[in-house]
Amino acid sequence: HMDDYFYPYPNPGEDFPDHVSFAQYGRGYSNKADWRRDNVNVLIKEIHETVRECKPWVKFGVSPFGIYRNKKNDPNGSDTRGLQNYDDLYADVLMWINNGWVDYNIPQIYWEIGHPAADYDNLIHWWAKHAASRPLFIGQDVMRTVNKADARNPLQNQMPAKMKLQRSLPTVQGSCQWYAAEVGDNAGNYRTMLEKEYHRYPALIPESPFMDDKAPGKVKKVKMVWTYEGPVLFWTAPKAKDEMDKAVQYVVYRFDKKEKVNLDDASHIVAITRDHFYPLPYNDGKTKYQYVVTA
């Protein structure tokens, strides 16, 4: 994973001192901005190719600054007035996405809904439209979210409105919270809301069919065994000849004895594990359950 640091964030009136490098290694470019973008493009492309060659199951992605380009500089840009990936950091994020050089994208939309220069609502719709060819997650600023009131409901912060926006856009697959310490400290009840409202149930890693579209085989020999610590569910990994076909994680579901099995209902997930076993809860032995294990 790479964060948002490509060329340095610019200081007013200062240029990055790379004129000697440009003169020596310009590769025929007459425009320094194009040369800088190409330097970053080459880096991203070569990292992607190296990861694919060495460990093709590993994902490589970025979390770029939240504005690609302003509409003032590009008709396809966002209706914003701020620093730009393309023009100021020399990071052509859309090129990386469209060429398949990154496996996911997490734009840092750290502003609030209604920000005069970089409106969260505006930006999330822009990224959802223009960066949908790779998994898209939204980078969220926890403190700015909880410290800003919802314009439609001033008694609450902007977390509910932002979550509603995310979930209304089919190409947005989730969000990342910045930074973790503020989630851990439960700033503005953020962690409580995640646990009780938005992420009550475990989530599976989104599919990446552009990397591998073949699911692992079915688990084998699922059985319950009594141990000195109580009942344990065991299973055997499916066979796989290729590294890409190996099962990495297993999902354990639990249903009532006569309940219809529905693997699309995340409320029935009791474990996501890399182990080949799961200790079963045991109360009085009278309540019966069905367990399903998938790879």
Go through each PLM region and give its residues.
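Solvent-exposed loop/turn segments flanking beta-strands in beta-repeat/beta-sandwich domains
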Residues: 238-264, 288
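Polysaccharide-binding and catalytic clefts of secreted carbohydrate-active enzymes
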Residues: 1-101, 110-111
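Short, contiguous acidic/charged loop-to-helix segments that flank catalytic cores in large enzymes
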Residues: 82-84, 110-115, 240-242, 268-271
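P-loop/Walker A phosphate-binding loop and immediately adjacent motor/lid segment at beta-alpha junctions
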Residues: 32-59, 117-145, 203-207
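Pro/Thr/Ser/Gly-rich low-complexity, intrinsically disordered linker/stalk tracts
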Residues: 189-246, 285
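Beta-strand-rich modules
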Residues: 279-295
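Short S/T/G- and acidic-enriched coil/turn segments that sit immediately N-terminal to beta-strands
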Residues: 273-279
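Substrate-binding cleft of secreted/luminal carbohydrate-active enzymes
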Residues: 90-116, 131-210
